Amino acid sequence: MIRKIFALSLGAVLALTPVQAFGKTVSITNVSYDPTREMFEQYNKIFEEHWKEKTGEDVEITQSHGGSGKQALEVANGLDADVVTLALEYDIESIENAGLIKAGWIDNFDNDSSPYTSTIVFLVKKGNPKKIQDWDDLTRDGVGVVTPNPKTSGGARWNYMAAWAYADKKYNGDETQMKDFIRKLYQNVVVLDSGARGATTSFVENGQGDVLVAWENEAYLSMRDYPDEYEIVTPSVSILAQPTVAVVDEVVDYRDTREVATEYLNYLYSDEAQEIEAENYFRPTNEKILKKHSDVFDLSVDLVNISEYGGWDEVQKKHFADDGIFDEIYER
């Protein structure tokens, strides 16, 4: 009789075990760059629902935002991040070089671990009083430019390389003339913030400068918040900006969060997430969803791929390392 009761009790415990697992909470931290704040605020809500439905677990997601280069340095120096969603491949490579992410991470998710893309545009005051149409106009006397610092901001490096790509086409690859062009542009910079969101604040809220060189999504968010005050100008040449994502292996193995961290990044490619990315003015990598939003995104702009300049390792060494071209042309 006692054995029978024990067996029944054990069976009851085993039957309850899966249900009790449904009360578990797991937590992860996503270290990201400046202009993704609003997008991840929305995305995290749908991912929490997705994870609960899939596993029965609750998930708590902590966000950290800042200039991409600075964020990468923080993670490399010990900021615990289960996942990183940064502005460019090079910033994640710097975390890999610190021994926290395994080699080959770029192949772990589709499209070189880039679930969405963007490009670089200009935000100007309503009516475009300075008549800014293309990169040439940013080198004119009397035009105040706002852009972040490429030493700390991934978006700023995309801004710089978009201008470099324009100069490359304009001067047929003559680097002397290209450097002069970039020098003139940066001589017109009135404030060089540490990150993209800080640059937006300087231009939109503090009224500094005549033109903000910005992520496309950041410019559209400003338009959404201040519909009667600003307008967007898309230059003739820009860059295919590819923000990238990765699981931080050292952290997830220590915290036992690999499964949820991997799914967190995988789900960025889902149709539901791609719609949220488009709503926040990032370009979905799902072509069908991108075309659905063609009334928002200019799909005709000439987007140069960073691979044309040897990829981010080469670009970083040539342009943004100490004594690189940026240091050469930016005299402040």
Stretches found by the model and what they are:
Residues G127-Q133, T152, A165-G173, V251-R258:
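Short helix-loop capping/hinge motifs at secondary-structure junctions, enriched
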